[in-house]
Amino acid sequence: MSEKPKRRVWARWVVLAAIILGLFLFTGLFGIGLGIKPIMPHVYLPGEKISEVPLFTIPGIGSLYYTNTLTGLLLADLVVILIAIGVSRGIKSGKMVLGGISGAVEALIEMLYGITEGTAGKWSKAIFPWFATITLLVLASNWLGLIPGNETIGIIHEYDGHGYAKKELFSGVYTIWDEGEAKAEGDHAESYAIIPFMRPVSTDLNFTFALAIVAVVMVQVMGFRAQGMGYLTKFWNVKHFFSKPIFGFIDWGVGLLEVISEFSKILSFAFRLFGNLFAGAVLIFVMGSLVPIFAPAMFYMLEFFVGLIQAIVFGMLTMTFMAQ
């Protein structure tokens, strides 16, 4: 029986020590090691345009541009696809227990399927793919926002307001810092800001509304699959309207409230996810501009769990409504 090779546990500590040493050399204890004061990134509600050339133009709507939140969406899609491929290969390999990321994803999927089976019963196989896909997509988009530097690496552009000075680091690569701080009144020097290449798509209302609409539409689809055309009586029940006018009027009012309830689900889904993730991103921006290392580390951990919880909540609400 061959002896298992010893794992070099010390190597990870060397890497960790090198990272910490680099942080201290470049930023110092409180981010002022090289005299470069951290700056506060500009906060934009909509996704920022990466290119000034529109992708295409829709008559009556206008031009659609490539934005940094679209980059976040494409990366989140890629992550979900790669996870699916990795887990599929791990299962086909015949291993009884998967390890690493594949094992963690398998455990998460088993947990999600168990929840679906306990809630949806015989409809679990039809509902689970939607539940799992939405959960994993939102989770990937939330956690991509925790990659350090994603909000500070991008395109420098002129900013008509409180911007910063631009300085060339080396050929074709620039930085902005506080030393040429924003245009003061009467100062005609140019000021600049950064448009990040990537921004978490869950901080864009367009994505959260689109995902909310998909979720609510699938709730209606599952309703028709389960009850047929009788599902419409949930919204328009006039069976007793003439035989028992009082009860018929009450049923009609309840149906009207159900219609309002379905539309309110879209608002609830969209603003809950957007509000939590956008607020978390702004919080990390602010703390990173004040104390660049230690304070943001705590909030990164907080946002790690917020991203996980929000993804599961969004998926579970969708699954629960589809199972009703």
Q: PLM features: what roles do these ranges have?
A:
Residues 2-324:
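Selective transmembrane helix interface/packing segments
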